[in-house]
Regions:
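N-terminal secretory signal peptides
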Residues: 1-15, 22-31
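N-terminal lobe/hinge region of extracytoplasmic solute-binding protein
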Residues: 59-111, 142, 213-214
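Gly/Pro-rich hinge or "lid" segments in bacterial periplasmic/extracellular proteins
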Residues: 93-94, 98, 188-243, 247, ...
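Surface-exposed binding/hinge segments that line
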Residues: 119, 155-199, 222
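Extracellular/periplasmic solute-recognition and catalytic clefts
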Residues: 154, 163-166, 221-232, 249-308, ...
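Structural transition elements
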Residues: 335, 339-372, 389-392, 484
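Extracytoplasmic/peripheral linker and loop segments enriched in polar/acidic and small residues
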Residues: 407-412, 416-418, 447-520
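Long beta-strand-rich cores associated with HINT superfamily self-processing modules
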Residues: 516-542
């Protein structure tokens, strides 16, 4: 089994490459990366001795060959790495998502204001030694807000942020379209990048391919796609999250067995690993490791091609959800570390409300809906990503659909293969994949706009955006974004999620917990995340 990228929305990172004419560039490192690289390094290096100067080795269960462009990426590995390399004006705590001053000197006193002014941290430098200026801030936000440039970050900002103005070399002003307090925590998604580097011809292609020059506590020293990425503490960093490790070596090991082996035993080759298989928790704990989970928006979802009959019929989509034995899936595949979806949002989300349509296992209702829709003799090929826990869940889906008379074929494939087909607009019936918008934040408005919207990439995949119900939904989503009253906004969100649940075009089957393992004798300050990747900005040697 292979874990290519746990967060399939992450997976669609490659889809954005087509907008820059760089599809496929993420598989190779640009030659210009050598300017900030130290050359090949053994993936087996663990520091060459003890002491505080030894290398921290981490095992990441996702590929490092996705887009590294902070304005585009949703790759688990790359986003986690970028959080150590780059800074936003503000950044957020990885668990609570409380904002703190990063490149800016303070958090705005009034989140409800329609202008936010920021002063840049004095003496802040990029990893090439050049100073961070207001021009760099404007450069990044201009890209994000450019109507002619399609980026993932655009969906997080364009609805509420009008423009970003330079006041002088050290000061900028953000002008909002309307009061939007949630925007404060979203500023971490706009990582400030050096204009003098990435405005050059081919600069964004280089960023996609792995070139990373930020102002954060760690400098990227080497990048080997599908192998490892290395870092070292940046000596000129003068911000609030100073590096505790002199060097770091992050290995990408997408196969579950070798990933577990690398962190196991007395001679383990790593101190921390994410994406721990549920079946290995006891083994690792027995070996003295701490294994902890984070529950959030991680989910297995089904996505239907609404232009492929009979999946244009909402009754068919609902029937397929009702048919799935989620209890068995959670018991057998997830070893109890999951819950059936009772809303698009997970139960712990502050905006959660049980949806009006909840797809409890009901094969009789599923059969009745198919009969009502006039569907019989249905044959379905499930196009799935081969993330290991998704692969573990697929047999339950097949058995459940077979049980109501559907001839079901499983077709798990490399993530890139699945979403290349989506980008090429190839025909398909249903996709089973994984998603976790908590990588970007916790607020429901962000989560829902990540998955739904008139220009949203997922909606292009579903071929549903021009549906009259979809158009009404998108208007309600925009109304919620603009609603200044928090409780009214919450109600609007909950009401439109009822529509999302009823239509089941792209909808979760289960929400599941993610597991991280580390050696508590060597590391302290680790907190398990409810989304893929790791954050070591507050960790240190024990």
């Amino acid at each position: 089994m292979r874990d290519v990228t746990h967060d399939v929305p992450a997976l669609h990172r490659r889809s954005f490459l087509k907008y820059t004419g760089a599809l496929g560039a993420a598989a190779a490192v640009s030659a210009s990366l050598s300017a900030c690289s130290s050359g090949p390094q053994s993936t087996n290096e663990t520091g060459g001795g003890g002491g505080r100067n030894r290398t921290l080795t981490a095992v990441i269960g996702y590929g490092n060959d996705g887009s590294w462009d902070p304005t585009q990426t949703a790759s688990a590995f790359c986003m986690a790495a970028n959080n150590h390399i780059y800074e936003g004006l503000l950044d957020t705590d990885p668990i609570s998502r409380e904002p703190y001053a990063a490149l800016a000197t303070q958090v705005p006193a009034d989140p409800s204001a329609t202008t936010w002014k920021f002063t840049l941290r004095a003496g802040a430098k990029f990893h090439d030694g050049k100073p961070v200026t207001a021009d760099d801030v404007v450069f990044v936000f201009d890209r994000i807000l450019d109507p002619k440039t399609q980026t993932l970050a655009k969906g997080f900002f364009a609805s509420w942020l009008k423009e970003v103005r330079k006041i002088d070399a050290q000061n900028v002003e953000l002008v909002l379209k309307f009061p939007f307090p949630d925007g404060i925590s979203r500023l971490t998604l706009a990582k400030i990048m050096p204009k003098h580097v990435f405005s050059q011809p081919g600069g964004w292609e280089d960023a996609i391919a792995g070139k990373a020059i930020g102002s954060g506590p760690y400098r990227q020293t080497a990048h080997h796609p599908k192998s490892n990425t290395t870092f070292e503490a940046y000596p000129d960093y003068n911000g609030p999250r100073r590096a505790a490790f002199k060097k770091m070596n992050w290995l990408t090991i997408v196969d579950a067995a070798p990933r577990v082996a690398r962190i196991s035993g007395a001679s383990a080759g790593a101190q921390i690993a994410d994406n721990i298989p549920y079946a290995n928790i006891g083994q690792l704990e027995g070996g003295g490791l701490t294994v902890a989970g984070g529950a959030g928006m991680n989910n297995l979802f089904l996505m239907f091609n609404t232009k492929h009959k009979p999946f244009d019929d909402v009754r068919v989509r609902q029937a397929l959800h009702y048919a799935i034995d989620t209890g068995k899936m959670i018991e057998v595949a997830l070893k109890g570390h999951g819950k059936p979806a009772s809303s698009f949002l997970n139960e712990a989300n502050p905006s959660y409300r049980r949806a009006k349509s909840v797809y409890d296992h009901d094969p009789d209702k599923a059969k009745a809906l198919l009969k009502e829709a006039g569907v019989s003799g249905l044959k379905i090929e499930i196009l799935a990503v081969n993330v290991s826990w998704i692969v573990d869940c697929l047999p339950t889906i097949k058995a459940s659909w077979d049980a109501i008379g559907i001839k079901t074929t499983l077709s798990p494939q490399e993530t890139t293969a699945v979403f290349t087909k989506m980008d090429q607009k190839q025909d398909y019936q249903v996709v089973a994949a994984a998603s976790n918008p908590n990588q970007f934040g916790l607020d429901a408005d962000l989560i829902m706009h990540y998955n739904y919207g008139p220009e949203n990439l997922w909606m292009q995949y579903t071929r549903w955006a021009d549906n009259s119900i979809a158009k009404a939904l998108f208007k309600d989503m925009d109304r919620a974004t603009r609603e200044p009253d928090a409780e009214k906004k919450k109600t609007i969100v909950q009401d439109y999620i009822d529509v999302v649940a009823e239509q089941a075009v792209l909808y979760p089957v289960v929400h599941n917990e993610l597991m991280t393992a580390w050696n508590p004798q060597q590391l302290t300050g680790i907190r398990a995340q409810p989304y893929p990747g790791i954050n070591l900005l507050q960790a240190k040697w024990a």
